[in-house]
C-alpha cells in the first residue's frame, strides 16, 4: 500500500486549505448560516422545516449516536464554530469536551464563548495527543479534507486508516464514533469540477463509501450507514437563498468576487446532491472488542488473548 505523504507536508497543506475557506470571516458566515453557525449538512424534517431546527436535529442525532447523555468526555474533530460542543457543555453538561479545528477564526470564536469544560485546539488530529480517552468522538465535515487530489486510492485508504486507528486509540472500549462526510457517488474524482477543487476546497479530495469501509476494516464495526444526499441539497439551497438575501452586506465584508464564488459553489453543490453525483454519508461506528475480528489479526497486527482482552482495549483502559 502506498504510504501517505510526509506528515509535515500534509499538515501544512491541510491547514492552508482550511484557512482559505473558513477564515473568510465570522461575520460573513453569520449572514447566511443559522444562529448556531453550523456549517454542515442539516437534517430537515420536510421541505417546510427551518434551517435552525434542521441543524439542531442533526446535532442531536450525532449526540444520540455516541450516547453523549451518558458520556464523561467527548472529542469533536472539526468543531467549526462550536455548535456541537455548546450542546455538550450547556445542554448535556458533559464535563470534558475537546474541539479540534484548523481555523484560527473558528477557534477564537469558540474560546470567546467560554463554555464550561470545553477546550478548543487549533490542531490537526494527526498531531493531537490526548491525556485521557474519550467516551465518544464526533467528526462532521472534516473527513472530506483528509485526502489530496493527487493521492492514489491506496494512499487515500491509508490516510483514512490513520484517522480510524487514532480514533480507536482515543476511545474507551464502550465508546462510539459518529462520522459525517460528503463522498463521491455517481461521479468519479476526474469528473469533479475544477472550480470546486481550486476555488472552494483546494488540496482536498472526497472519499467513497468503499474507501471508508476498507479503511475502517478490523478497527471499527460499522453499525449504521445513511446516505442523506437530499438533506444536503436542501441545506445548500437554504444557504444559497440566505446569502442572496444578504448579498450586499456580504459583499461589504468579503468582496463581491468572494460572494459570487460562494453562491456558485452552493448552487453546484445542491445540484450535485440532487443528481446523485455526491452523497452525504452518516456512519455510526463502534470499536471491535477483543482486539480481532473474524479470526483475523487486529489492526495493529496482534491477536487477542483467550480472555478477550485485546491490546487496544488494554491501551485505552490505561490512558
Per-range role (PLM):
Residues 154-173:
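A short glycine-rich, Lys/Arg-flanked "PGG" loop and its adjoining helix->strand segment in the class I
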Residues 174-181:
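Conserved beta-strand signature within the Rossmann-like core of class I S-adenosyl-L-methionine
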Residues 126-140:
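A short acidic, Gly/Pro-enriched loop at the edge of an enzyme's catalytic core
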Residues 115-126:
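Conserved SAM-binding strand-loop segment of SAM-dependent methyltransferases
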Residues 70-78:
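Conserved class I S-adenosyl-L-methionine
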Residues 1-31:
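N-terminal auxiliary segments of SAM/dcSAM-dependent transferases
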Residues 182-282, 286-293:
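Substrate-binding/catalytic lobe of Class I Rossmann-like enzymes that use SAM or dcSAM, i.e.
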Residues 81-93:
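Conserved SAM-binding loop of SAM-dependent methyltransferases across substrates and taxa
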